[in-house]
């Protein structure tokens, strides 16, 4: 992967939404470490008299983002930074998931065109590489989608997180969903931290985490259960489906400790 920072160019009529978010959390950390650069591009600066929208042909209600400001902004980026991989936010676009995030993290330049109003003039699609969405619902604009892309991609770039293991522990990055997490105090209002996590027994903790990852996936997202299971995963999955608890299963598998 290139040692150069991954550059995000966000075409929007609300650039402050992007610049504000870039001052916090993982994105700020990625920028500070030189792994990411975020450029909010105000479409009004590329529009004659600042007009970025107009009425749609065909008598539909609402307004549509004009093609000229977007093409002008695109040309500016190409001339000054090089050709980017272009995303446009659309409700019917490909849903953002961890696999796509990992693919995007390998790009050098990503442009995100934020939709608004009734949409973007279809002629803009000529420069678009991918339509992208967060799900089957409507947002007021694409800025939230753009921020999700920037945040998710930034955190998987090598060197951004201070603890790289955190990435592998993430739901969706791992084969299974995440496991329950706990912190101090050990007991609160009668609710105790599982004794396995306090044991200091690394293999026991590892098995506990795997069991609860699989259990979490079975209960919350059974559609994500992998098909290529290891023998241990098959054993745990079948035990969960049969109604066994972790402690019951562990009694039968003490040889794993």
Swiss-Prot record:
Residue stretches in coiled coil: none
Biological-process GO terms, alphabetical: tRNA N1-guanine methylation
GO molecular function: tRNA (guanine(37)-N1)-methyltransferase activity
Enzymatic class: transferase
SS bond partners: none
Pfam families (UniProt xref): tRNA_m1G_MT (PF01746)
Assembly description: Homodimer.
Entry similarity comment: Belongs to the RNA methyltransferase TrmD family.
Function: Specifically methylates guanosine-37 in various tRNAs.
Name of the protein this chain belongs to: tRNA (guanine-N(1)-)-methyltransferase
Organism of origin: Aquifex aeolicus (strain VF5)
